[in-house]
Swiss-Prot record:
Pfam families: OTCace, OTCace_N. One of its GO terms (cellular component) is cytosol. Belongs to the aspartate/ornithine carbamoyltransferase superfamily. ATCase family. One of its GO terms (biological process) is 'de novo' UMP biosynthetic process. L-aspartate binds at K92, R176, R230. Heterododecamer (2C3:3R2) of six catalytic PyrB chains organized as two trimers (C3), and six regulatory PyrI chains organized as three dimers (R2). The keyword Cell membrane does not apply. This is Aspartate carbamoyltransferase catalytic subunit. Its EC number is 2.1.3.2. Pathway: Pyrimidine metabolism; UMP biosynthesis via de novo pathway; (S)-dihydroorotate from bicarbonate: step 2/3. It comes from Lawsonia intracellularis (strain PHE/MN1-00).
Length: 315
């Protein structure tokens, strides 16, 4: 690995993509690429973060993000400690602020936060001395997911992002993944399209740097990749469509839809995915699918982020 500070990494926290420069993005991608090969070793361990403590504070359910952060930390020899809201003092009425200050008193180097409230990561970052990494806050942002999505495409496209077209289809209104991906893909020179029912388009989307569609057959024409999103029923406070079956008839990605995309178009999904609602089961394990590649990419990207924050930070 590179010597300390070679990246001139100047960030205390990772809250969203818009704080990163294009140089930062490529530092993350190149570091992830270097670390990715360790995942195929018999012994998947590096001593890089020995002696560092990482707290995974997850106040929302998670499989992929939590486990991949834990594996990422352990593969770099850090000590990772998991805290769930359901088993923390939050259940006894303790505030997020007091819980965070309690954790800080234990001298962690990084707190990785997943929370249902938009802005929770910024709140902790302003409060705490240690680094805070946003692992998803409400509808707001999920920067490491966007980075691993781009890393998955980078392994296929190389540096040839400029002029590519990517469609994001599904519940874009309630998706933090959508928001972070729109920012990152635009930074990479990609033209982004969104496709949702009108009731599931984000507020103010007309001001986003995207093309907006409500017809999947039209939206998918000629695209280089499709990112499918789950319908987030747990975030819906009212009905946005007649039924899940009616939604699937119009917005479930099928092989027929994909025939209108570029021949080598890739299919992605941040997970968890709903077969037959977000996309057809037959697409999940095809050569065009990067869905399980994204899971592997998540480990490498999160290793890279932990490495940069804990060994290359000049602050």
């Amino acid at each position: 690995m590179q010597e300390k500070n070679v990246f001139n990494w100047l960030h205390k926290d990772l809250l969203d993509i818009d704080q990163l420069s294009q140089t930062d993005i490529f530092n993350i991608l190149n570091t992830a690429s270097s670390l990715d090969e360790t995942n195929s070793r018999v012994i998947k361990k590096l001593p890089t973060l020995r002696g560092k403590n990482i707290i995974l504070f997850f106040a929302e359910p998670s499989t992929r993000t939590k486990v991949s952060f834990e594996i990422a930390g352990k593969r770099l020899s850090a000590d990772t400690i998991g805290v769930n809201a359901s088993s923390s003092s939050i259940q006894k009425g303790e505030s997020l602020k007091d819980t965070a200050l309690t954790l800080q008193a234990m001298s962690p180097d990084v707190i990785v936060l997943r929370h249902s409230s938009s802005g929770a990561a910024l709140f902790l970052a302003d409060l705490l001395e240690c680094s805070v990494i946003n692992a998803g806050d409400g509808w707001h942002a999920h920067p490491t997911q966007a980075l691993l999505d781009v890393f998955s495409l980078w392994k296929v496209w190389g540096n040839h992002f400029h002029g590519k077209e990517v469609l994001i289809v599904g519940d874009t209104a309630h998706s933090r993944v959508c928001r972070s991906n729109v920012t990152l893909l635009n930074l990479m020179g990609v033209k982004v399209r969104l496709c949702s029912p009108r009731t599931l388009l984000p507020s103010g989307v007309e001001h986003w740097p995207v093309e907006i569609y409500t017809d999947l057959h039209q939206a998918i024409c000629g695209v280089d990749a499709v990112i499918c999103l789950r319908v987030q029923l747990e975030r819906h406070k009212k009905s946005f469509f007649p039924s899940i079956e009616e939604y699937a008839k119009r917005f479930c990605l099928t092989p027929k839809h994909l025939m209108s995309a570029k021949t080598e178009a890739k299919v992605l999904h941040p997970g968890p995915f709903l077969r037959g609602v977000d996309l057809a089961s037959s697409l999940i394990e095809t050569p065009q699918s990067l869905i399980f590649d994204q899971v592997s990419a998540g480990i490498a990207i999160r290793m890279a982020i932990l490495f940069l924050f804990l060994t290359c930070n000049d602050l």
